[in-house]
Amino acid sequence: MTTPQLRPQQTADRLDWLAETLDEFAPFEAAQRIAPHLGAQPRDDGCVEVGFWTPALVEAGIPAEDVSLEMFTPTESVDPSAPESTVEFDRHRVPLRREGEYHWGVIEGMQIGTREQLGSLYQLVYQKRGRKVPGRDDSLDRDGWGIVPDPLADSVPFGVFAPAECYDIERLDADRADREYFEALGSDDERVSTSEHDGLPRVEPAVSMLEIHPSTATESGSLAGLARRYREIGRKQRDGEELTPAERNFVGYDAIQVMPVEPITQQHGTHHFWEPGEFDREEASETLEVRVGRPDMINWGYDIVISAFAAPNPAVLETGRPDELVDFIAACHNLPEPIKIVFDIALGHADDGAIPLLADEFFEGPGMYGQHLDYQQPTVRAILLELQRRKMDYGADGIRVDGAQDFRYYDAERDEMVHDDAFLAKMDEVVQEVAGTEYRPWMIYEDGRPWPQEDWELTSTYRTLIEQHPHSFQWSPVTFAHNTPALLTFWATKWWRVREVADMGSQWLTGVANHDTVRRGSQVVVGDSWDAPQENPNLADDMPATLDAAYNNPASSMLFHCLLPGVPMDFLNANMRGPWGFIRDTDDTWNVKVVAEEAYVVDWQLTDETFVDDRFFPRLKSLGFETREGLREFIQRLADTVEATDYHLETMATVLSTLGTPMGDDLSYKDLKAFGQAWMADMHEYANLSHWTADQDDDRTAFDLAVREFRHDRPWLRRDVGEADSELFDYRHPTRGTVLYYGLRESPAGDEQLLVAANMEGQPVEVSPAILAEDEQIPDDGWEVALAAPGVDSEAGTDAAVVELQDSQAIIWQREP
């Protein structure tokens, strides 16, 4: 292969274009035009164009001739999926050219990555010569050289703290298996509905949606594993073969919201995926060995570092190839009934791990989740929007903007933080292009403003961005983290919010099961004192079964899928009645505190039987925890010491040693950190849904699927209750020990009426159309049972039949007016 070198004339041409752009346009407009060209982009002539924004180097006076592109090209075939290997690389360093705050170059001789081969790895380096670059974290620097990673990288097979990979994204698009799906958008042949918006097709909202966490959804914990799962489901559907009970939990939806698949931070004391041997950076080229490994960080996906945001998280790539993300999307698009993919885009914050990866201009200062980003800085603003565009161009049909209320900036005149709604509007304007087709995605905002204002739970309307962007959707008030349906009186005290869903929820995401709510439900402390929260005793006999029954609940499922407006969303782990909690091993500083906050997961998610199961908790058992009760006692004491010592690890270890622990009576802070790591790794494995596949109940999963299909047969249910004069939604009051919701819906054509009654919680209650008609203007004849929860005796199927609904049971009657 050709030795990498700078092509002077081609580089000069690009610098001329760069200078003209900077001179002709205002800062933000110029940055918008430049951002699509940043990173490493293969050209038609076989060269690679490389561009970096480096304001700190320019401000510090680093001479242009001291700035180079450093490349590592493998001399042999590399398997990025290997847990660990030693690879020989040819290293080359090529000087770049400067224009304004940018360093640029057209490079000949870089190896371009594909599905089959690892491309050249690269990063920007500069000679420090004893100079300190103000405002720049230098923790990545080595041997008198500064290192600047590429924040617009397309592939980071060994993590964001390793050099990025030069990757052929255009080939990935050209070879995707769902090109026809995108080519048909906006035409009579489209497989999913779109509507015209500013001259382009905008993907229409889903009927219902499933949220999936890739690293616990399948045995492999990878996007490749999910692609295999949906390809197999598609094969069975085409062949008329029955799905297994577990497979049913994946279908019945026309959209999937994937929890974030962006590169995340790493714990530097534990995660070592790129370890070069000795080499001399002064040399322009040499050969060296590097120990590399497939990243295996554990995380929900929200601890992102912004850098390489456009690339897939290598920890969810089985092969280390970005193609896996496209393969998964294509598998869903090519199903007999296509499933749309919604990306969970978390650009509202950056983990502290981003500090050495990004220019200081990216940060406004510390925030609730690490670093608050500076959305007002023109180039940062443009780069963030470009990162969104590139990521969505993998083929997403929709975008969920995580924590939209966190996109804020400081207004000096008002002396307060202000919501940057103009930036959120820019996010909505981004146009995607896949397979040569331009389109706009379905837009969803998670926005709970004025959170974290003290009275946010009362004052949040969850409609601000819908009012600004009438085509957009938001998460509903019953979908946010603070909803805990396993607690007694939840459905009584949340009635006012559920009623809002009925009245104005047509553009809300609804449902009470998602990654946030199940976690919050597992953290609730219940007790025997008169003022302590109380779990609903009617759901199940123990707390783990109670939690499962609360989030995979026939009554609430029928409520959201068969009666109320909006787009109901379920959570795969809840569908499977599998474990879930806050899992991450990427934070050495706060890991023990995070584990302490999960103390009551032992009560809510573990049983004596599951703890002693040889499949689970091997690391905790190796530390001395032989019983669930021993673990429960220790972790609750750990939580108490966090509060008592203000999270001083050494003092915590001393206090716990005095009390005695299964780990011994002479603990150090290192022992507590080891416990935290063991907890996270064991909980991650425990939550993998492959362990719970055989436990899926045939009748229950068949019913759950029937509920979702009921919604899909009646997409008109998405409109608000009350658009037809006959429609209503209410609850029986006084409750008399039972929270009974009921409602009537009528199709737009007037050819079908549905009557729903649901015992949301409480004592058994008798219902029938005639009984409900005693208090409401409901027709009392012509009703037949359309769907009933398991256990409801509805065989008679006539309007005269009275049925008894236990807690969490519901029934739907149907009639033709």
Briefly describe each language-model feature range.
Residues 213-224, 303-322, 366-382, 404-421, ...:
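The substrate-binding groove and active-site-proximal loops of carbohydrate-active enzymes
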Residues 234-250, 324-339, 375-399:
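An active-site-proximal structural segment forming one wall of the substrate-binding cleft
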Residues 1-210, 223-238, 254, 547-558, ...:
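Carbohydrate-interacting/catalytic domains
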Residues 333, 350-460, 517:
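Active-site neighborhood of glycoside hydrolase catalytic domains
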Residues 435-630, 643-660:
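Conserved alpha/beta catalytic core and glycan-binding cleft of carbohydrate-active enzymes
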Residues 268-323, 330, 351-379, 386-387, ...:
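Aromatic- and acidic-residue-enriched carbohydrate-binding clefts of CAZyme catalytic domains
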Residues 208-212, 256-258, 341-345, 399-401, ...:
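Hydrophobic faces of well-ordered beta-strands that scaffold small-molecule active sites
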